[in-house]
Amino acid sequence: MKKQIIAGLLAATALLSFGCSGRNAEFGVVDMHAVESKAAVVKTVQEEVTTKGKALQDEMNTALEGKTGDERKKVLEDYTSRMNVIRSEAQNKLKASLDTALNEVAKEKGLGAVLIKEAVPQGGVDVTEDVIAKMK
């Protein structure tokens, strides 16, 4: 019985030391709502999408004049596809900017991870303003 208790304690100690060693327990949190509303790059990208979307809409309306049936459907599909590409490029640009900012802030502050603030009930270092400042 004594051997089992000692073996259990050794196993628990080994698991704890293995699981905790070399890992940074500090983590950051970022408020994504604040990032979306305050980051200049978000506003710039949204304006670009709106401008390109309006131009595409005007172009589509011109292309649709006099079209009926299958021709009209084909034009609509083409312009919908082009708008989806514009949106996808905008999302990729924002994601790249956010990822770069998060990595830089985490490295500067020595954080093991940065999590979305809404998903963390408590704790963490709030890095929202730092992330907003670094987004380009």
Q: Which residues does each PLM region occupy?
A:
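Bacterial N-terminal signal peptides that target proteins for export
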Residues: 1-7
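C-terminal motif of bacterial Sec signal peptides marking the signal peptidase cleavage site
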Residues: 15-19
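Amphipathic, charged alpha-helical segments and their helix-to-coil junctions
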Residues: 21-136
